Design a protein with these regions (language model features):
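C-terminal motif of bacterial Sec signal peptides marking the signal peptidase cleavage site
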Residues: 16-19
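Bacterial lipoprotein signal-peptidase II cleavage site
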Residues: 21-26
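Short, solvent-exposed mixed-charge patches
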Residues: 539-541
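Positively charged n-region of N-terminal signal peptides that target proteins for export
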Residues: 1-5, 10
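Concave beta-strand-loop units of leucine-rich repeat
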Residues: 38-50, 59-72, 81-95, 100-121, ...
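Histidine-anchored nucleotide/phosphate-binding helix
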Residues: 54, 122, 189
Length: 541
């Protein structure tokens, strides 16, 4: 046993002695050879290609890489090799190169135009604690440093218009500033946290002290401050603090560009009326979208003679003989009427879709009887729909109505392509379902819905969609017909007593009297003399 152990020890010693005799291959970096076992310090200029060769020097303890320009790669290598003391230099400009262990830095002598480039190099100085910038004419340099390293102590003297600027001031007068002054101040505003009031004096909307776009930038830079400016716009005296702006029936010729710029600077604005201003719908929509906290109202046109304001809650346009036939080509503007609750577009046989209903989330009553509508998909976005007269149309799919869980009254008579009412099975609020005798719903489905909705009256016998109890429920004592509860509410909501077929026609607009030639039956001359009215007055083929 002892003899075997002795043999093992002798064999191990032989192997060690054999290894000691092997030659160590040097590491060559830029023509200089380094012993990987004994090299602990190096001084060299490296590139991104040669820097990885330092990994082949496992005994390395210190590396002076001053003069090297691949700073991102050097910084990453140093972080990956914390056991090596890495030294390098950072060129801030041609005549200013500092070591990476710099703690304090004075950049006051750097030309202002070169300062931004110098600041970009500071992240390569991990030991840096304080920086002196000297006199600054704008705050961009200080902002850059604050964003790069919030813990860095930065000293500077802010100047504006040749004078030292007090960043702690609470009030500022800009009534006499130039565009250049405003641009320079813009960079300082985020640092003026105590600023509370900024006055721009008074003047016109067309010639403010600074451009409206610039003013909007300044307001965004100092949101805690109130900017004041009294100005005249289209003959109206206004201020930036106004909460309402009424421009209705004022002809505006720039598609609302000036109004859009001004209202963006009115943070308290909650109501803007631009009825009959001649601005196209798409431009008005841009103004509306630019003011999320403000109700923006304008006039839209649809059909060939219908019109209404976008804040209208009820629209009645069921007289093609006056307002023209409604069709997919001339009803698009209705999408801007996002507050509509009550909508009657019946008797329009060319009406083929309801795309505009996608934008009517508050819709409660809908009448599209005697139309060509076949797709109810937009109604899936109308969860508050209560009353729907869909009879005598081209329906073939009721699935979108499954989302209308508040639906109480539904008339689907005279829809010859409709064969499935299963989407209605979950409408537990439904109290009246008029199918009539001509809509081909399977008997089994009729019996099933009666079972599922025992409180719902289901009519499958009447030929006339509006006969019997759908609209009239007996007579009053004086012999007058008594409307059913659902229809009576519809009449109230739609204000049928005001106009039985249409009050969306142009001649019924009450605004014509104060702004026209003295009566409500003729549009004012300035409207009739417009070069172009963007509406198709031809009847669809």
């Amino acid at each position: 046993m002892r003899k075997k152990l002795l043999c093992v020890v002798l064999l191990s010693l032989c192997l060690l002695l054999a290894g000691c005799g092997q030659k160590v291959e040097p590491v060559s970096i830029d023509g200089t050879e380094y012993n990987p076992r004994s090299t602990t310090e190096v001084t060299m200029v490296v590139t991104e290609e040669t820097l990885p060769l330092l990994d082949e020097l496992p005994a390395l303890e210190s590396a002076d890489l001053s003069g090297s320009l691949c700073l991102p790669a050097i910084q990453a290598w140093a972080e990956a090799h914390p056991q090596v003391a890495v030294r390098y230099t950072v060129p801030l400009r041609d005549d200013l190169v500092v070591p990476n262990d710099t703690v304090s830095l004075d950049l006051s002598g750097v030309p202002r135009e070169e300062l931004p480039e110098a600041l970009l190099m500071l992240p390569y100085l991990p030991a840096l604690q304080e920086v002196e910038l000297g006199r600054l004419e704008d705050g961009s340099a200080a902002s850059v440093l604050a964003d790069q390293d919030p813990g860095l102590r930065v000293s500077y003297t802010p100047t504006w218009r040749g004078q030292t600027l007090d960043l702690n001031m609470s009030a500022l007068d800009l009534s006499q500033v130039t565009v250049g002054d405003a641009r320079a101040l813009l960079s300082w505003l985020p640092m003026m946290q105590n600023l509370r009031t900024v006055s721009l004096g008074s003047g016109s909307a067309e010639t403010p002290p600074v451009s409206w776009d610039m003013l909007a930038e300044m307001q965004a830079a100092a949101p805690q401050a109130e900017f004041s400016y009294a100005f005249t716009l289209y003959g109206k005296e206004l201020t930036l603090q106004d909460t309402a702006l009424d421009l209705n029936h004022i002809r505006i010729g720039d598609q609302g560009a000036l109004v859009k710029a001004i209202t963006a600077c009115m943070p308290q604005l909650r109501y803007l009326d631009m009825d009959f201003c001649g601005v196209d719908d798409e431009y008005m929509a841009e103004i509306r979208d630019n003011l999320p906290n403000c109700e923006v109202v304008w006039r839209i046109w649809f059909g060939t003679g219908y019109t209404c304001r976008t804040d209208e809650v009820r629209i009645l346009a069921s007289n093609p003989g006056i307002g023209g036939e409604l069709s997919p080509d001339n009803t698009g503007p209705l999408k801007y009427c996002t507050k509509v609750k009550y909508l009657d577009l019946g008797h329009n046989s060319y009406l083929g879709n309801l795309d505009f209903c996608n934008y009517m989330p508050d819709l409660e009553s809908l009448v599209i009887a005697l139309s060509n509508v076949h797709d109810l998909s937009p109604l899936a976005n109308c969860p508050h729909l209560h009353y729907a007269e869909l009879q005598t149309s081209a329906l073939n799919d009721l699935r979108p109505l499954a989302n209308c869980t508040e639906l109480t009254d539904l008339n689907i008579c005279y829809n010859f392509s409709l064969t499935d009412i299963t989407p209605l099975y979950g409408l537990t609020s439904l109290s009246r379902l008029w199918i009539g005798c001509l809509t081909p719903i399977p008997t089994a489905q009729v019996e099933e819905i009666k079972s599922l909705l025992p409180n719902c009256t289901v009519n499958t016998k009447d030929l006339d969609p509006t006969r019997e109890e759908w609209r009239w429920d007996g007579e009053y004592d004086n012999g007058m017909l008594k409307p059913s509860a659902g229809y009576e509410q519809l009449r109230i909501n739609m204000e049928y007593d005001r106009a039985p077929f249409s009050y969306s026609y142009i001649r019924n607009d009450p605004l014509y009297a104060p702004h026209g030639q003295g009566d409500n039956t003729t549009p004012p001359d300035w409207f009739m003399n417009q070069e172009a009215i963007p509406y198709d007055y031809s009847i669809p083929e």
